[in-house]
Amino acid sequence: MTSATIPGLDTAPTNHQGLLSWVEEVAELTQPDRVVFTDGSEEEFQRLCDQLVEAGTFIRLNPEKHKNSYLALSDPSDVARVESRTYICSAKEIDAGPTNNWMDPGEMRSIMKDLYRGCMRGRTMYVVPFCMGPLGAEDPKLGVEITDSEYVVVSMRTMTRMGKAALEKMGDDGFFVKALHSVGAPLEPGQKDVAWPCSETKYITHFPETREIWSYGSGYGGNALLGKKCYSLRIASAMAHDEGWLAEHMLILKLISPENKAYYFAAAFPSACGKTNLAMLQPTIPGWRAETLGDDIAWMRFGKDGRLYAVNPEFGFFGVAPGTNWKSNPNAMRTIAAGNTVFTNVALTDDGDVWWEGLEGDPQHLIDWKGNDWYFRETETNAAHPNSRYCTPMSQCPILAPEWDDPQGVPISGILFGGRRKTTVPLVTEARDWQHGVFIGATLGSEQTAAAEGKVGNVRRDPMAMLPFLGYNVGDYFQHWINLGKHADESKLPKVFFVNWFRRGDDGRFLWPGFGENSRVLKWIVDRIEHKAGGATTPIGTVPAVEDLDLDGLDVDAADVAAALAVDADEWRQELPLIEEWLQFVGEKLPTGVKDEFDALKERLG
């Protein structure tokens, strides 16, 4: 079919010529049965959900348990981000840097155009306009995703400000990021579809200079919801580098003291290190309250007053389900319980509810994430996939901060970096200054988890928790952080801290109770910002003594807390060659500032 004969192309609700010609070009290439411009309405959402139920992609959950909620079970080959198939196709290879896969953009376009040719046959092509961050921003960051997946359309409605309002913001000639997605599963006439279409061949490709995303073959999460990691981190980090701001893999937390003073924190942790749990913290210390502004991504820029302001570009939560429960994260559970949630790859109970590992209760029988019968204490595999997800509107969160939709964002008092480390790294450390803070973030190490492909348990360096999400050279990225600090008023820069909730004793148990008790660590951080709290100067930064932490009412052995806070010079000396190996890997673009910090650390450790 030519674009003139594809139904729906002639009824576009926009006069944006750039958008229209791109939509036509993609339709001619991919050959869908029809084109639909999405409007983001409730009616459209319900219609698509009904369609997904009919197709067998969605299972409608018991409305008495989860109203207006659904479960999707993916193909077992399509369950997580595929870092091995994710590319940054900058014009020059050096600009992608050592942490990214690179291919010549011309060559990649040619390969992917061959894959896209006719790939939407038998399917509907949806045009999904969306905005990352508040629609009322001075410079709203707009995008359009073209997709042949209804699952993507309904998820994008939850995760972004999607539909008519975003399209109107574009006007007739506004700039937008082009995001093209196909599951790569064309249907021949009369061919029956599968519940979760995808392809064995997968590419998730970014063209940073032209601000484009091309994704093929996966229907899952970050590979397919292109507003999330692809735009908000990979493309946005390249934009931020060019425009003088930061796009970061960080939660945004508001902490309110008993005196009713608010402090805002941005915190970067690798996947599955408790980012969502901290974002939705329930403080255990009397008089302290927490509110959330986001659990995954922060866009930060300096305001006119010289302070660093953060906004969350997302509109929903796309959280890891296993381990989320009424004890670890009651606020996430309340958000989910409000309904309007799409679950992916969790288990289904006999009464139409969902279940996953770590959730209260021991159901005797379930349908597992692969669609098979699962029996308590008999079936040896997990009922829910370790990277199974809930996709739910942010507006349902009971502790959502009122500023969550403010285009100005919130002023950041402290930046936290953290990872999952059994040894070496203390519970909390304050960086000596901004550049030392950049070094701490740049050399962040964490034991690997299930959210990405790779060997679980290995310590991998994950700079600023951005390793899989950098849209340009990691050395240039470190330099960008250093430069922003140099150009700022030092007295207004956020203080930088490193936390590790996961340190273990010799017997393998956790030394710190974590979860809501982490508010005690945050209280010390606030007191450091206010110049009220003590701490010991160590070779790695300032670390509190046991008595510097407010442990009132906490049933924990002081020796355990001391062990969690210990700085063992021998352990750190063993860490040095691992850090050095990573810095050598960063290569020729490693900033002198980061190298200087490493040399100074070596010297302090003797």
UniProtKB/Swiss-Prot annotation:
<dbReference type="GO" id="GO:0005886">
    <property type="term" value="C:plasma membrane"/>
</dbReference>
<feature type="binding site">
    <location>
        <position position="420"/>
    </location>
    <ligand>
        <name>GTP</name>
    </ligand>
</feature>
<keyword id="KW-0547">Nucleotide-binding</keyword>
<dbReference type="GO" id="GO:0046327">
    <property type="term" value="P:glycerol biosynthetic process from pyruvate"/>
</dbReference>
<dbReference type="GO" id="GO:0006107">
    <property type="term" value="P:oxaloacetate metabolic process"/>
</dbReference>
<feature type="binding site">
    <location>
        <position position="81"/>
    </location>
    <ligand>
        <name>substrate</name>
    </ligand>
</feature>
<keyword id="KW-0479">Metal-binding</keyword>
<feature type="binding site">
    <location>
        <begin position="515"/>
        <end position="518"/>
    </location>
    <ligand>
        <name>GTP</name>
    </ligand>
</feature>
<dbReference type="GO" id="GO:0005525">
    <property type="term" value="F:GTP binding"/>
</dbReference>
<feature type="binding site">
    <location>
        <begin position="272"/>
        <end position="277"/>
    </location>
    <ligand>
        <name>GTP</name>
    </ligand>
</feature>
<dbReference type="InterPro" id="IPR013035">
    <property type="entry name" value="PEP_carboxykinase_C"/>
</dbReference>
<dbReference type="InterPro" id="IPR035077">
    <property type="entry name" value="PEP_carboxykinase_GTP_C"/>
</dbReference>
<dbReference type="GO" id="GO:0005829">
    <property type="term" value="C:cytosol"/>
</dbReference>
<feature type="binding site">
    <location>
        <position position="296"/>
    </location>
    <ligand>
        <name>Mn(2+)</name>
    </ligand>
</feature>
<feature type="binding site">
    <location>
        <position position="249"/>
    </location>
    <ligand>
        <name>Mn(2+)</name>
    </ligand>
</feature>
<dbReference type="GO" id="GO:0005576">
    <property type="term" value="C:extracellular region"/>
</dbReference>
<keyword id="KW-0963">Cytoplasm</keyword>
<feature type="active site">
    <location>
        <position position="273"/>
    </location>
</feature>
<dbReference type="Pfam" id="PF00821">
    <property type="entry name" value="PEPCK_GTP"/>
</dbReference>
<dbReference type="InterPro" id="IPR008209">
    <property type="entry name" value="PEP_carboxykinase_GTP"/>
</dbReference>
<dbReference type="GO" id="GO:0030145">
    <property type="term" value="F:manganese ion binding"/>
</dbReference>
<comment type="subunit">
    <text>Monomer.</text>
</comment>
<keyword id="KW-0312">Gluconeogenesis</keyword>
<dbReference type="GO" id="GO:0004613">
    <property type="term" value="F:phosphoenolpyruvate carboxykinase (GTP) activity"/>
</dbReference>
<comment type="function">
    <text>Involved in the gluconeogenesis, in growth on fatty acids and is important for initiation of infection in the macrophages. Catalyzes the GTP-dependent conversion of oxaloacetate (OAA) to phosphoenolpyruvate (PEP), the rate-limiting step in the metabolic pathway that produces glucose from lactate and other precursors derived from the citric acid cycle.</text>
</comment>
<dbReference type="GO" id="GO:0019543">
    <property type="term" value="P:propionate catabolic process"/>
</dbReference>
<keyword id="KW-0210">Decarboxylase</keyword>
<comment type="pathway">
    <text>Carbohydrate biosynthesis; gluconeogenesis.</text>
</comment>
<dbReference type="InterPro" id="IPR018091">
    <property type="entry name" value="PEP_carboxykin_GTP_CS"/>
</dbReference>
<dbReference type="GO" id="GO:0042594">
    <property type="term" value="P:response to starvation"/>
</dbReference>
<dbReference type="GO" id="GO:0006094">
    <property type="term" value="P:gluconeogenesis"/>
</dbReference>
<dbReference type="GO" id="GO:0009274">
    <property type="term" value="C:peptidoglycan-based cell wall"/>
</dbReference>
<protein>
    <recommendedName>
        <fullName>Phosphoenolpyruvate carboxykinase [GTP]</fullName>
        <ecNumber>4.1.1.32</ecNumber>
    </recommendedName>
</protein>
<dbReference type="InterPro" id="IPR035078">
    <property type="entry name" value="PEP_carboxykinase_GTP_N"/>
</dbReference>
<dbReference type="GO" id="GO:0033993">
    <property type="term" value="P:response to lipid"/>
</dbReference>
<comment type="similarity">
    <text>Belongs to the phosphoenolpyruvate carboxykinase [GTP] family.</text>
</comment>
<dbReference type="InterPro" id="IPR008210">
    <property type="entry name" value="PEP_carboxykinase_N"/>
</dbReference>
<dbReference type="GO" id="GO:0071333">
    <property type="term" value="P:cellular response to glucose stimulus"/>
</dbReference>
<keyword id="KW-0464">Manganese</keyword>
<keyword id="KW-0456">Lyase</keyword>
<keyword id="KW-0007">Acetylation</keyword>
<keyword id="KW-0342">GTP-binding</keyword>
